[in-house]
Amino acid sequence: MSIQEVRPNNTIYINNLNEKIKKDELKKSLYAIFSQFGQILDILVSRNLKMRGQAFVIFKETSSATNALRSMQGFPFYDKPMRIQYSKTDSDIIAKMKGTFVERDRKRQEKRKVKVPEVQGVKNAMPGAALLPGVPGQMAAMQDMPGMTQAPRMMHMAGQAPYMHHPGMMPPPGMAPGQMPPGGMPHGQLMPGQMAPMQPISENPPNHILFLTNLPEETNELMLSMLFNQFPGFKEVRLVPGRHDIAFVEFDNEVQAGAARESLQGFKITQSNSMKISFAKK
């Protein structure tokens, strides 16, 4: 289906994802590469076997979903190009915000599942007999079709964080890495992916290598690479053996390192960890 056939909305549907990636890691990585486009309300990854390699990212604003779709279409993610389109229908969370949410009739679905063996039994007892119109269960197979209106149970994630551009690409106009529109969080609380208030950091002379501190325990090389790879001149991330809370990020020159430092200073990878960035000592 072509992207243009579905009306732009807050939710993007992504498929062709690497099925070997664990669910938790997949959610964190999607979170890391898409949150720069705007506030993310949810990331949905299905437990259903038929929905492996697929996910939904729900943004607060439609414009954020549009920017994400245009910028990340075909981007190589875990060695597979992502295929992205708008979701065919609003997710539950967006429908509730719009006042259009309708509770699914789960009892009717369960009744259909129960009556399927009865219909099959009649057919087996009377070879060649046609099924009667309107008999519950004739369309039971349709229940397993994936989609937002009859979706399988989804894994839930709240929060956000930035993405990788193709080399040389710059963030969309007006969007700084990690920036998110004002959300509904109580005063003083930040969702993951938001910038914490700037705190004074001891200054070292400019350097092409950045020193990161206050990183959460789940930080890994891939996650940091996704955060910093969007900036021109990025070379590599170096973790410190035995230390999960610090890392080094190298750029081609001091100017490029400084730009990344300024943009990601105070970035919250998790609710409790605001990343601190300084120039490494020479």
UniProtKB/Swiss-Prot annotation:
It is found in: Nucleus. GO terms for molecular function: U1 snRNA binding. U1 snRNP is composed of the 7 core Sm proteins snrpb, snrpd1, snrpd2, snrpd3, snrpe, snrpf and snrpg that assemble in a heptameric protein ring on the Sm site of the small nuclear RNA to form the core snRNP, and at least three U1 snRNP-specific proteins snrnp70/U1-70K, snrpa/U1-A and snrpc/U1-C. Belongs to the RRM U1 A/B'' family. Component of the spliceosomal U1 snRNP, which is essential for recognition of the pre-mRNA 5' splice-site and the subsequent assembly of the spliceosome. U1 snRNP is the first snRNP to interact with pre-mRNA. This interaction is required for the subsequent binding of U2 snRNP and the U4/U6/U5 tri-snRNP. Snrpa binds stem loop II of U1 snRNA. One of its GO terms (biological process) is mRNA splicing, via spliceosome. The gene is snrpa. Residues 10-89, 208-282 form the RRM domain. Gene3D superfamilies: 3.30.70.330. The keyword Glycosyltransferase does not apply. This is U1 small nuclear ribonucleoprotein A. Keywords: mRNA processing, mRNA splicing, Nucleus, Repeat, Ribonucleoprotein, RNA-binding, Spliceosome. The keyword Repeat applies. InterPro entries: Nucleotide-bd_a/b_plait_sf (IPR012677), RBD_domain_sf (IPR035979), RRM_dom (IPR000504), U1A_RRM1 (IPR034407), U1A_RRM2 (IPR034409). Pfam families: RRM_1. GO terms for cellular component: spliceosomal complex; U1 snRNP.
